[in-house]
């Protein structure tokens, strides 16, 4: 305002100066000067008044503007005061987001590290697996080669086991052989007793045809006189025949024991000739047609002599020797006709699997007349017809032992 007033005064002064410079010719008159000064004051006053109005308008506009700015400032302060809680939440959210980003970066780094470790471990495991597969393949090939070598060359342990089993079998066979020897000794003693107490063989040959028809009726009756002697002599012949068979069995068992011992010593390499001999001996013992039984302790007669029953024969007395020869010849033919497949030796059922249990011994009996081998004869084995059956039986036993 002061500047404006000063400007107005200056303007007045300039006007005055300008007016003073433009002196009119009538300036000498005092009335004209008063009119001019009055006119200048009026114009100056009007100009000042006009300027004052303008300044008042401007001042009111500025006040309005200041008031509006003050209102805006107050509103901004109120907004700032009200938005302080939101800012805190925004700050918290920002800090949380920053922490989450940091955790994400850490997890990414850990994941990369773990994936790298896993790839390395997987690579190492695959290499180990390949090595193990190669080792397993090598072990399989080694096992297969060892199995092939074992099949070709069995180890000593298997031979030892086989040797032990063979020794056990040999021990069992030796025990059976001892039992058979005891049986043979008992039978020999009984035969000697029967030979001492029995009558002559010629009387038995004369009385056999007369006594045989009466045998079925006297089966359960004690025998006396020539009938009893005939039965005793017949039992003697049967025992002699079975003794020959037992002797053959013992010879074959001894042969088998020797073969088993040689097989165990030679690592179970069985010779072809031994197998053929064993099959031949087993064929000799294959007496499938014979089923006669002999009791170890026969009942005694009232006179203190052992009684024995023999089945009746349908052949006449004059053909008795020929029938016995045919029996022996049929045995030899059956022995030769028996097939031999080279299998292991097996004892036949004809001589007593249960001999140690029921106190009895089962012997082979003569074949029946219905068999095909019955009646066949060979001149090189049969003795002269003048010899009694006992003598040619001994000769036949000797021939069998010689062949065995």
From Swiss-Prot:
Any GO BP annotation = T cell activation
The modified positions for Phosphoserine read 330, 365
The question of whether Cytoplasm is a record keyword is answered with yes
Q: Which InterPro entries match?
A: TBD, TBK1-IKBKE_adapters
Organism expressing this protein natively: Rattus norvegicus (Rat)
Instruction: Give yes or no: UniProt keyword Phosphoprotein.
Output: yes
**UniProt-recorded name of the protein:** 5-azacytidine-induced protein 2
For this UniProt entry, which residues form the secretion signal? none
What's in the GO CC field?
A: cytoplasm
Interaction with TBK1 and IKBKE as annotated region, ranges: 229-269
Disulphide connectivity of cysteines: none
Q: What is its main location?
A: cytoplasm
Q: How is it modified after translation?
A: Ubiquitinated via 'Lys-48'-linked polyubiquitination by TRIM38, leading to its degradation.
Q: What is the lineage of its organism?
A: Eukaryota, Metazoa, Chordata, Craniata, Vertebrata
The subcellular location is: Cytoplasm
């Amino acid at each position: 305002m002061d500047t404006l007033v000063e400007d107005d005064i200056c303007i007045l002064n300039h006007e005055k100066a300008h007016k003073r410079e433009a002196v009119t010719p009538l300036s000498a008159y005092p009335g004209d000067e008063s009119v001019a000064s009055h006119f200048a004051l009026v114009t100056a006053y009007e100009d000042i008044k006009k300027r004052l109005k303008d300044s008042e308008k401007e001042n009111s506009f500025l006040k309005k503007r200041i008031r509006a700015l003050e209102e805006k400032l107050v509103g901004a302060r109120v907004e700032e005061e009200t938005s302080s809680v939101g800012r805190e939440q925004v700050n918290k959210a920002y800090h949380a987001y920053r922490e989450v980003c940091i955790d994400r970066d850490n997890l990414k780094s850990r994941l990369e590290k773990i994936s790298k470790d896993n790839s390395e471990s997987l690579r190492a495991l695959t290499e180990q697996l390949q090595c193990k597969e190669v080792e397993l393949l090598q072990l399989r090939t080694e096992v297969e080669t060892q199995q092939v070598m074992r099949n070709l060359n069995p180890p000593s342990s298997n031979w030892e086991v086989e040797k032990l089993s063979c020794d056990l079998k040999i021990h069992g066979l030796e025990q059976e052989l001892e039992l058979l020897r005891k049986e043979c000794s008992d039978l020999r003693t009984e035969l000697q007793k029967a030979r001492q107490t029995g009558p002559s063989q010629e009387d038995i040959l004369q009385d056999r045809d007369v006594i045989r028809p009466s045998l079925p009726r006297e089966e359960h009756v004690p025998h006396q006189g020539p009938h009893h002697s005939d039965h005793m002599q017949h039992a003697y012949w049967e025992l002699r025949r079975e003794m020959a068979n037992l002797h053959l069995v013992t010879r074959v068992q001894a042969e088998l024991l020797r073969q088993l011992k040689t097989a165990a010593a030679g690592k179970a390499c069985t010779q072809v000739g031994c197998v053929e001999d064993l099959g031949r001996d087993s064929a000799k013992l294959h007496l499938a047609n014979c089923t006669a039984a002999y009791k170890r302790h026969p009942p005694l007669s009232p006179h203190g002599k052992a009684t024995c029953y023999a089945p009746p024969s349908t052949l006449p007395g004059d053909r008795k020797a020929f029938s016995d020869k045919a029996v022996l010849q049929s045995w030899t033919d059956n022995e030769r006709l028996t097939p031999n497949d080279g299998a292991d030796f097996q004892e036949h059922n004809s001589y007593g699997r249960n001999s140690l249990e029921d106190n009895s011994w089962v012997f082979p009996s003569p074949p029946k007349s219905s068999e095909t081998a019955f009646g066949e004869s060979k001149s090189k084995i049969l003795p002269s017809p003048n010899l009694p059956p006992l003598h040619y039986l001994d000769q036949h036993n000797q021939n069998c032992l010689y062949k065995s």
